[in-house]
Structures are given as structure tokens and as C-alpha cells.
Amino acid sequence: MYSTTDFRRGLRIEIDGTPFEIVDFQHFKPGKGGAIVRTKMRNLLTGRIMDNNFRSGEKVGRPDMENRDMQFLYREDANLVFMDMTTYEQIYMPEETTEGKAGFLKEGQTIRVLLFNGTPLAIELPAALVLEVTETEPGAKGDTVSNVTKPATLETGIVIQVPIFVNQGDKVKVNTDTREYMGRE
């Protein structure tokens, strides 16, 4: 059980059997009565944001969640298929629940999957990944103006902006949160 004094951004709580993640919170003391904690929470099953008020000191449940390393196998229609590395069980996850992170997945890649009562909710990618450039325009020789970028398609299919000197076949380091080029490998 968590108390409202434990609330912080990113804390996962359970209310009436539904997992939520606290997006924002504020302690509020009205002129009359006890203090309350105003929260903005994201329902981890639906993705919806909702506001909720708690009395100061109120207790909320701790969700039965676990992070498990899984191997990404393939895409099937609008689902991603993962395999549990210990039980070899396959788990299907709707692609829309990944919040755009599915574009970084390569077949055979091991990533961390967040599960709630055995149901996959989210994937956690490393902060940076090294991916190969499969398609980009050749850079013009002698074009040395600073900060010139061009679009490049990576092996997973996502398109990012890269400096003009990056060529097809180069391996680049990409920030998975911002989708920005970090350097060549």
C-alpha cells in the first residue's frame, strides 16, 4: 500500500483493480478542512488521463506489476509478438500501446516488457540504440555548412534527421526518447 505522502511522478498505483501512473500531483490545503492531494493520472490499460483528489494520508494499492526481459519476434497485423525468455511463452501486444516505440524494434532484440497480471502494458527501450542506415541521399561534396541535415531511413523503418556526411550502410546511434541522431558508430 502507498500513502499519499509517497506520491511522486511516475509512481504506479492501483485503484479498484486498475493500474494508474501518476503524471502530476499537488498537495493542496484549503482554508477549511483537511489537506488533499490533487493528481493527474494515466490509466495504464486505456492510456486516458484523469484527475483525482485524495485526502492527505489516504492509502492506495500497489499494482501487481513486473518487468520481464522478452525477445521481440515479429509483427502480426497490428500486434507485436514477444517471447518470454524463461518460459518460451509468446505474448501479443497491440502496437498502439507502445506510444510510438515500436518503430525501434528489430526482430530478435531483447527488451523489457511491463506486465500487469500477465497482460503487457508497455515496453522499455534502452536510452540509445545503434541502427543501420538503409536509405539516404548522398551528401554533396564540399557542403560544409554547419547543421545541415537530411532524412535517413533506418533498418527498422523509422526516419530521422542525420548530418550530411552520414551515408547508406553507416551505423548511427539514436536517442529512443527524442528520435534524434547522437553519433556514428
Curated annotation (Swiss-Prot):
PROSITE patterns, sorted: EFP
Any Gene Ontology CC annotation: cytoplasm
Signal peptide residue numbers: none
CDD domains tied to this protein: S1_EF-P_repeat_1 (cd04470), S1_EF-P_repeat_2 (cd05794)
Pathway info: Protein biosynthesis; polypeptide chain elongation
Annotated GO MF terms: translation elongation factor activity
Keywords: Cytoplasm, Elongation factor, Protein biosynthesis
Protein's cellular compartments: Cytoplasm
GO biological process: peptide biosynthetic process
Pfam families: EFP, EFP_N, Elong-fact-P_C
Main localization (coarse): cytoplasm
Function recorded in the entry: Involved in peptide bond synthesis. Stimulates efficient translation and peptide-bond synthesis on native or reconstituted 70S ribosomes in vitro. Probably functions indirectly by altering the affinity of the ribosome for aminoacyl-tRNA, thus increasing their reactivity as acceptors for peptidyl transferase.
Family annotation (NCBIfam families): efp, PRK00529.1
Stated family: Belongs to the elongation factor P family.
Protein name: Elongation factor P
Organism: Oleidesulfovibrio alaskensis (strain ATCC BAA-1058 / DSM 17464 / G20)
Lineage: Bacteria, Pseudomonadati, Thermodesulfobacteriota, Desulfovibrionia, Desulfovibrionales
